[in-house]
Amino acid sequence: ACKQEREAELSLSSYLYDFGTITPDSIYRDSITLTNVGNAILEIGEIETGCGCTHASVDKYELEPKESCALHFSFNPKGKGLGAKEELIIINANTDSLFYILQVKAIIQ
């Protein structure tokens, strides 16, 4: 009999988030859902952002199989200039993929 491998696997409800057209004088916030679609405990490690203008946090750092949590993120466009901007939020985890990327976009005007 084969022994089934137990692995954690992370799924993001969105891999691209577009704030649309925004102004530079507000902070924009939203969240997506992270789900452990594997069959072992998922451990979320460091959450990295590309610059000080972007922040991200999770409600939980350990997810049982089929369990979900929110990834909250914010973008402060002040001082970023006008036009199309793109920031990355990198989520590290104990999975085969090692990390997952949420791309955050906006047009500042």
Residue ranges and their predicted role:
Residues 37-40, 79, 95:
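Short, acidic/polar linear motifs in exposed loop/turn regions
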